[in-house]
């Protein structure tokens, strides 16, 4: 431990872009006091954020769910279930997600997604978290998403297009 007062230490996981994303995860660990959790909730509220409290586990709640959903969407794309844009539309219209899992993966960075999945697989000793081979292929080719102009989608002048060489 690097502190004499672990009861006063809290983690807060913000989402990018921070000014636009309303959620913050407040990370509870074994030694934290309820007062510290309450102060973190208050701080989040004063920043205009909604907060959830999660235990200190790999991936917390949101990253763990997000990367698994993204990895499954990549699997579906590789299997030819639907095009990338149709998979994303299914989640936007069918589940009211503001952005589909494939577009979000491109925004976050496919390399980041892969690193998180590998970290979860190692932490939980569970190969179900391993990145799909298509994700590995894209990252190894340097197709990392929006930041490189190519990932699941082709990113032109701010517009995205389905790639012809992936899935359908």
Could you say what each language-model-derived stretch is?
Residues 4-7, 31, 35, 68, ...:
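Charged, alpha-helix-enriched surfaces in structured cytosolic catalytic cores
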Residues 58-65, 80:
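Glycine-rich phosphate/pyrophosphate-binding loop and the adjoining helix
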């Amino acid at each position: 431990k690097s502190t004499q007062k672990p009861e006063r230490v809290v983690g807060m996981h913000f989402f990018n872009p921070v000014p636009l994303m309303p959620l913050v995860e407040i990370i509870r660990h074994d030694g934290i006091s309820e007062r510290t959790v309450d102060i973190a909730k208050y701080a989040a509220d004063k920043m205009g954020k909604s907060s959830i409290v999660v235990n200190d586990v790999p991936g917390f709640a949101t990253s763990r769910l997000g990367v698994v959903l993204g990895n499954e969407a990549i699997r579906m794309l590789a299997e030819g279930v639907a095009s990338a844009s149709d998979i994303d539309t299914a989640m936007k219209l069918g589940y009211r997600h503001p952005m589909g899992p494939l577009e979000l993966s491109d925004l976050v960075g496919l390399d980041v997604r892969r690193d998180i999945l590998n970290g979860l697989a190692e932490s939980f000793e569970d190969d179900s978290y391993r990145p799909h081979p298509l994700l590995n292929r894209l990252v190894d080719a340097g197709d990392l998403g929006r930041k490189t102009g190519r990932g699941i989608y082709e990113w032109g002048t701010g517009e995205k297009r389905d790639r012809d060489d992936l899935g359908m």
